[in-house]
Amino acid sequence: MKIKTITCHDVYNVGASLQAYALVTYLRKLGHDAQIIDYKPDYLSNHYPLWGLGNPAYDKPVIRELYNLAKLPGRLKARNGKRKAEYDRFTAEFLPLTPRRYTSNDDLKQNPPEADVYFAGSDQIWNCFFPNGKDPAFYLDFAPAGSVRASYAASFAMDDIPEEWKPDVKRRLSGLDHISVRESSGAAIVERLGIPGAVQVMDPVFLLDSEAWASIEKPVPNTEPYVLLYDFDRNPEMVRFTRRMAEENGWKLYSVLSCGECDRCFEQDGPLTFLNLVHHAQFVVSNSFHATAFSLIFRKQFVVFNRQEHINTRMRDLLYGLGLRDCLMDSAGSDCLRIDYPQILERLDEKVSVSKAYIENVLSEGKR
């Protein structure tokens, strides 16, 4: 069966890259001809610009030009740097993309990639705070009549969507044959819109087991026992907590992002190095959804620091659903409890089974 998936697959973000890989790889393991639609509208295509303003305060004659000239050397270095190269290499080697690149929903509608079944997802494709959450393409608006349209683990990344977007979102969701979402909050949003039958499933990274992930990870040379920090928010409490844990246990402090307190920083590395870092950490401290997901996959001890923003819905939902409420910390002074994995794995396996059953149900309709 021909299957096409659409997601934000090439945005230089570790979670986005790995979830895109996971879904298409799982579908291929089931024996299907699955590809990711190479969908790159303008708003998903300008991650390493050479010219542009990061601060509107500089948007004045002459100052604008001076600002861009001052930023140009650093931007050239980033565009030609290791991090971009690592992500580009991952996309080229591990993501089976359609031969054609599409740049708009109209482009897709005029010449849609052929498939029996289309999956939209996973990750934050329906986050209305981002342009993709308002893009009809991520609701499979382009899919031809007669094909099966389904979402897989799509995320709104919030507890509710803005009132002004509800009519459009409802109309677009109504065009799907099957709806699955990643969070219980997403299922509640769909239900409040008057659309029944949304299924909550796990992020696609859970469709592959730890051995499958370990088989593609990139080894990190010359490591010592370490605690891994992944801090999106530059939270000083997280850094202090992680440094104290490292000192108390005689570990090094490794960080996925730049951090003045770390012993080694891996900001310029790509998704495959990230997998190895989580896999071999003694402990993981993060405020990242996918760092949390891979900590579970690799059976690591971990804590998650709360994020004071809408996006925190993702981590809360995952942890609460597995009975890991105590792993979500509000401050560095919170207690850190050891995770009892035999009990957690039973719940996780049940949720993954539901997720796989949902996919089978969608595909069974595509066979008719």
Descriptions of predicted regions:
Residues 1-368:
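Active-site anion-handling motifs in enzyme catalytic cores
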